[in-house]
Amino acid sequence: MQEWFQNLFAATLGLGDLGITVGLVVSVIVKIVIILIPLILTVAYLTYFERKVIGFMQLRVGPNVTGPRGLIQPFADVFKLLFKEVTRPKLSNKALFYIGPIMSLAPSFAAWAVIPFNEEWVLTNINIGLLYILMITSLSVYGVIIAGWASNSKYSFLGAMRASAQSISYEIAMSAALVCVVMVSGSMNFSDIVAAQAKGIAGGSVFSWNWLPLFPIFIVYLISAVAETNRAPFDVAEGESEIVAGHHVEYSGFAFALFFLAEYIFMILIAALTSLMFLGGWLSPFPQSWGIVGTPSAFWMFVKMAAVLYWYLWIRATFPRYRYDQIMRLGWKVLIPIGFAYIVVLGVWMISPLNLWK
């Protein structure tokens, strides 16, 4: 695509060297649009799917009025949010009040720049893709803190403090889990990490993926991922029964929609990251000798992401909310020690004769 645009602007339109630069910029913009539009549509229908799944588990119907089987409900919700008035508390900080939602949403979009869907479908294939993801996603906590403080509300500020403390705490446990994957893969490039999962004793099958030899740390990662995205049962940052709606209690209309969009995009990002790091990415769960079913494809990447997202919804419909002190105790006294201990265990394992990743 990049070469096509560069040839178009340089040769066809006669812009020369300037056309090469313009073609590069245009190709990047087109790639960004190709990623963001399906992502936003996925968020819209993920909300619909969430309400349907939870309704089914609670013996309800879920959305069924707007359109056939309620399929147009996400668009009705979008129009409602777009046309609602964006109110602001009188004593709030106007500039920071509007910067908060933007700072929460921007990192969730920027993180997708390095997420590959197969060996070719990636915006930017860099060797420190995992480090970039950890760095860019950690910035979203600033948007939460700014929104909570700028609202000039005790409920918003308390929710922001809870959300930021929880996010920072579980980021440590999640990072420890991802360090284990880097150790066995020998790279922070997502394509290399996926390729490494096709090797080993059980190479070419579901049993060679990282979830099996790293199963204890895989569980630590999954729990940390739910807490990192402030989803149930770790959603104390917006506990309706305690602090109304957390850091975005004073937001309405389009400003609230930005927080909402950021939360669900982070969910999808975690699903993609889980697929790449532990579930083989675009690798097929079947041996390649099975023909087209065993061929690596972006289809398998999307299937695994959908499975992780369904797991998110199942967790929300099943488990009650934790108390805040229980969440912090689980993170600091259980998950973080397990994460660091497993790094040591894995290091010893890899230098022993029982190394599975040779």
Swiss-Prot record:
Classify the protein's membrane topology as the record does: Multi-pass membrane protein
Q: Which GO terms describe its biological process?
A: aerobic respiration
A GO term, aspect molecular function: oxidoreductase activity, acting on NAD(P)H, quinone or similar compound as acceptor
Name where it's found. Cell inner membrane
Q: What's its catalytic activity?
A: a quinone + NADH + 5 H(+)(in) = a quinol + NAD(+) + 4 H(+)(out)
In the UniProt record, does the keyword Transmembrane helix occur?
yes
* Any one annotated GO CC term: plasma membrane
Entry EC no(s):
7.1.1.-
Q: Which UniProt keywords apply?
A: Cell inner membrane, Cell membrane, Membrane, NAD, Quinone, Translocase, Transmembrane, Transmembrane helix, Ubiquinone
Chain segments annotated as transmembrane: 20-40, 95-115, 128-148, 168-188, 206-226, 253-273, 295-315, 334-354
InterPro entries for the chain: NADH_UbQ_OxRdtase_su1/FPO, NADH_UbQ_OxRdtase_su1_CS
Task: Say which domain of life the source belongs to.
Answer: Bacteria
- Return the similarity comment: Belongs to the complex I subunit 1 family.
Per its database record, what is this protein's job?
A: NDH-1 shuttles electrons from NADH, via FMN and iron-sulfur (Fe-S) centers, to quinones in the respiratory chain. The immediate electron acceptor for the enzyme in this species is believed to be ubiquinone. Couples the redox reaction to proton translocation (for every two electrons transferred, four hydrogen ions are translocated across the cytoplasmic membrane), and thus conserves the redox energy in a proton gradient. This subunit may bind ubiquinone.
The record's note on quaternary structure and interaction partners says:
NDH-1 is composed of 14 different subunits. Subunits NuoA, H, J, K, L, M, N constitute the membrane sector of the complex.
What name is this protein filed under?
A: NADH-quinone oxidoreductase subunit H
Q: Which organism is it from?
A: Neisseria gonorrhoeae (strain ATCC 700825 / FA 1090)
